[in-house]
Amino acid sequence: MREDAFQIIQKTIADCLPDKAVRDSLQKLDFTGKVYVVAIGKAAWVMAKTASVFLADRLEKGIIITKYEHSRGALDKFEIIEAGHPTPDENSVLGAGKAVELVKEATQEDTVLLLLSGGGSSLVELPMPGLTLADIQEVTRQLLFCGAGITEINVLRKKLSAMKGVKAVIFKSPCA
């Protein structure tokens, strides 16, 4: 019985790994035109690597935006940006801008694949007009200091950022 429980736990964990989740999901999709990949989060590199292998020659280019020291090295056709987590930094803004640029390259015939994992709300940042990165950093620091959870932090991030929630449509490409 103990061995059965251990095997069930191992299988459950294996099924939740980002590479398996991405591979299983990609097998269900049809891709048209060139494929552009935007991978954001602490598991972004692993997800992008899996997508790269799966897509092979269909992959046009991509961007990986991940936490510092979470990249495992260069990936062909991908630009890698490491950024601040849990507090966004200048690279979070840089990554957001580069993601917008990449998505805008796609045409109506192309596919844009967005791969998101935990940490993404900090790793890409585009302050709403009238706000600065410093404003968002200060709000984040204060929320972390007072013990706010990620749910509370993300509620405010959606109000302060042009990259969160439905406001992300501002960078929709012609293929959207």
Where are these regions (language model features)?
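N-terminal loops that bind phosphate or other acidic moieties
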Residues: 1-163
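Phosphate/diphosphate-binding loops
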Residues: 158, 166-176
